[in-house]
Amino acid sequence: MAVKEGYDVLRLIEHGQTCYISSEYVRGRPLAWYIKEHPRIPKKLLLEWILHLERQLEMLHKCRNHPCYQYVNPYSIIVSEEGGLYFSDMEAGSNEEMLRLMRKKNIREHFLPPGMPYYRKASVSLDAYGLGKTVQYLLAMTEADPKLNWKETGRLRKMTSHCLNQFSKRQIQNISEIRKYIPIYQEKQPNIAGKSRAILAVAALLCVLAAACRVGKPHPGCRNEIGREGERQNLCRQ
């Protein structure tokens, strides 16, 4: 398949409790191809991507008539040249070639529930399934810099497990249910308190040493008196 430089994507506009859909053309590449070329991704960006995809689906579901995307996968997500993340407009004729790629058996089997055709009626749970599979793909194909810690990894596993459990009694009714599992990136703060304690300890030690030096040395006035007394004793002996 020839690599296109641009795609028609969905632009979601939120206005109060309602969202609106429009379509626009952006220059970029499908997420699946982008991460093959850039497998090492800043952890901050990786977590922001996952949160952004969840948020985009949430906004889509709030649009008029509550539409669903139907087939979420790394080929249906476009990374623009500016670094933005968008869902492809699958109804746009310009994306027909990409749609044919996504219909291939090896891709369908990985990003759709077992035995389910891509044309099945769209639903929130199906969107959640595709998102869970896409996040699994991201984690498998990329290396976060710095690496995800055990807590972040555990939360993302819970998220994907919840997304993929299609037959649970607690099937996802609202995509926002999974947001609580998505870690928020936090810069590691320097240990200012520890450094302050170390500085205070050194200062206290210097004060103690200075005091010890003063105790061990006679006062200059005392040295003068001792010197004069010695001179008087020498005169008397003479």
Tell where the protein language model's regions lie, with residue ranges.
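Conserved HxN/HPN-centered segment at the entrance to the catalytic loop
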Residues: 2-17, 65-66
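Conserved short submotifs of the Hanks-type protein kinase catalytic core
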Residues: 15-30, 34
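Activation segment signature within eukaryotic-like protein kinase domains
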Residues: 49-50
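Protein kinase catalytic-loop region centered on the HRD/HxD motif
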Residues: 54-68
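Hydrophobic HxD+1 residue recognition
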Residues: 70-72
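Hydrophobic residue at the +6 position relative to the catalytic HRD Asp in the kinase catalytic loop
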Residues: 75-79
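C-lobe/activation-segment region of protein kinase-like
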Residues: 84-162
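Terminal C-lobe "cap" of eukaryotic-type protein kinase domains
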Residues: 165-191
